[in-house]
Amino acid sequence: MQKRAIYPGTFDPITNGHLDIVTRATQMFDHVILAIAASPGKKPMFTLDERVALAQKATAHLGNVEVVGFSDLMANFARDRQANILIRGLRAVADFEYEMQLAHMNRHLMPQLESVFLMPSKEWSFISSSLVKEVARHQGDVTHFLPDNVHQALMDKLK
């Protein structure tokens, strides 16, 4: 049986920290679905279609990654995609408390859905899409934190 995992997030935009997690997940699972949440309540900078396109290009070198947008409840999305593993990145203790709540709710909604927590490599442990966007808005250099295509798209958005 194929191990299908979902790595969900808003990915507004996808960072090298996200790529670190998804790359490592591809070594653990047969198929990884990078599930980009519509998240209209977060008021993303990039549209869902833009985020999907940016992530597709950034992960094109990974043969077992599928990038899709979604707006459904995560448990329902996982069931529809026949995935029973949910990948989540943990940067700090504060992340764990929130992620634990999500994991328990997802397990309540879909008992066979296991949450797997991955810590990013040390190099990426402090970055988030929000932080990268904030630094970029103030003309800080965020080149190191983003795939090239994403960096260019962010610079274009901020013009």
Swiss-Prot record:
What are the subcellular locations of this protein? Cytoplasm
Quote the record's binding site residues for ATP.
10-11, 18, 89-91, 99, 124-130
Q: Name the Gene Ontology molecular function terms of this record.
A: ATP binding; pantetheine-phosphate adenylyltransferase activity
What's its EC? 2.7.7.3
Which residues carry the site feature described as Transition state stabilizer? 18
Positions contributing to substrate binding: 10, 42, 74, 88
Cleavable signal peptide: none
One Pfam family linked to the record = CTP_transf_like
Q: Which GO terms describe its biological process?
A: coenzyme A biosynthetic process
Q: Which UniProt keywords apply?
A: ATP-binding, Coenzyme A biosynthesis, Cytoplasm, Magnesium, Nucleotide-binding, Nucleotidyltransferase, Transferase
Q: Which cofactor does it need?
A: Mg(2+)
Q: In which pathway does it act?
A: Cofactor biosynthesis; coenzyme A biosynthesis; CoA from (R)-pantothenate: step 4/5
Under Gene3D superfamilies, the record lists: HUPs (3.40.50.620)
Positions in coiled-coil regions: none
Q: Which family is annotated?
A: Belongs to the bacterial CoaD family.
Question: What function does this protein fulfil?
Answer: Reversibly transfers an adenylyl group from ATP to 4'-phosphopantetheine, yielding dephospho-CoA (dPCoA) and pyrophosphate.
Name used for this protein in its record = Phosphopantetheine adenylyltransferase
